[in-house]
């Protein structure tokens, strides 16, 4: 079954979805296909996760992916790697201060193509 993205106008997001689908196919990793399908849905269905929630449920060294935005409410004390579509300005500043790594979803998928030990937060 192919995933076609016809309703998205944001070229960067379309490329992100296509990249996730390609990585999923090459490595038989269902997690990246799931992320692509979530992003292909309407924007109203995207997740918006605050830093305090990531800090509450993550452990040091975890890889967290968010099919949506990471917002800057709360603080983060754990050293985690976060992949998301968008990071708010406040979240970016707090992540830099705390020493966390943050990147796009396709970069996380390229770094971990099998998707092992990756947690999805919604």
Swiss-Prot record:
GO molecular function: structural constituent of ribosome
InterPro entries per UniProt: Ribosomal_eL18/eL18-A/B/_CS, Ribosomal_eL18_arc, Ribosomal_uL15/eL18, Ribosomal_uL15/eL18_sf
GO cellular component: ribonucleoprotein complex; ribosome
Entry's Gene Ontology BP terms: translation
Alphabetical UniProt keywords: Ribonucleoprotein, Ribosomal protein
Family of the protein in this entry: Belongs to the eukaryotic ribosomal protein eL18 family.
Protein's name in the database: Large ribosomal subunit protein eL18
Gene: rpl18e
């Amino acid at each position: 079954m192919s995933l076609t993205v016809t309703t998205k106008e944001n070229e960067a997001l379309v490329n992100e979805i296509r990249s996730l689908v390609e990585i999923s196919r090459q490595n038989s990793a269902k997690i990246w296909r799931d992320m692509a399908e979530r992003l292909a849905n309407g924007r109203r269905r995207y997740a918006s996760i605050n830093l305090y929630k990531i800090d509450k449920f993550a452990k040091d060294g975890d890889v967290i992916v968010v099919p949506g935005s990471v917002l800057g409410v709360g603080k983060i004390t754990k050293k985690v790697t976060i992949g998301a579509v968008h990071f708010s300005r406040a979240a970016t500043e707090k992540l830099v201060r705390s020493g966390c790594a943050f990147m796009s979803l396709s970069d996380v998928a390229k770094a971990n193509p099998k998707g092992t030990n990756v947690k999805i937060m919604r």
